[in-house]
Design a protein with these regions (language model features):
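Catalytic core of pol beta-like nucleotidyltransferases
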Residues: 2-29, 36-109, 120-203
Length: 203
């Protein structure tokens, strides 16, 4: 009996991961917890013990993107990375790093472009944007730095060729420590302009 229950729970977990991935891909939801809750609600699941981990949802999202509209996804991802690269070059003095789904390849058509910038003060980034005529707004982003610490950092949101860019501003020495990824709890992958250039195949 326990073995049967375990298999049923595993099947349900898999179904929830697939549904959460579908919701993220088709409805532009990027928050894993929100996608899990919506998936559980749609499948009538109340047991939080069977909710999938974020890494399981990300794997299901990759599978969904491979099976449904792969050409469209690849085209959109390349466009997002090109815009990210142009923006990084524009903000080169702040040592920009691309992070998140546009870097890892799981971005949907609704995904924002997420950058990490490094400066003594976030105002210097704002001044740069004003100088080049880019409207923007300030907000705070809570970032998990390790297992015990979460810190609020200033961030700026602006448009770049029809895509939303979210740029979090870290202190200059913040380039040495990458925050934890919300997907797997490990240090987040970061890519500089050269690495992004390699991804899109441009010089």
């Amino acid at each position: 009996m326990p073995k049967k229950f375990s298999q049923r729970a595993e099947d349900l977990r898999r179904a929830l991961a697939l549904e959460a991935a579908r919701i993220m891909a088709e409805h532009g939801i990027e928050d894993f917890l929100q996608a899990k809750r919506k998936a559980a609600d749609r499948l009538g699941v109340n047991d939080v013990a069977v909710l999938p981990k974020n890494v399981e949802i990300e794997a299901a999202l990759r599978e969904h993107q491979r099976l449904f509209g792969r050409d469209s996804h690849d085209h959109t991802l390349k466009e997002q990375r090109r815009i990210a690269l142009d923006t990084m070059r524009m903000l080169n003095e702040f040592q920009p790093r691309l992070v998140g789904s546009v870097l890892t390849g799981t971005a949907t058509a609704y995904s924002d472009i997420n950058l990490h910038l490094f400066a003594d003060a976030s105002e210097s980034v704002a001044i740069k944007l004003l100088e080049i005529g880019v409207p923007h707004e300030f907000y705070e982003r809570r970032v998990k730095m390790d297992a015990e610490r979460s810190i609020n950092y200033p961030a700026l949101r602006f448009d770049a060729n029809g895509r939303t860019v979210d740029a979090t501003v870290f202190p200059i020495d913040g380039i040495r420590q990458s925050p934890y990824s919300p997907v797997d709890g490990r240090p987040m992958k970061r890519a500089d302009a050269r690495e992004v250039s390699d991804l899109v195949g441009v010089n």
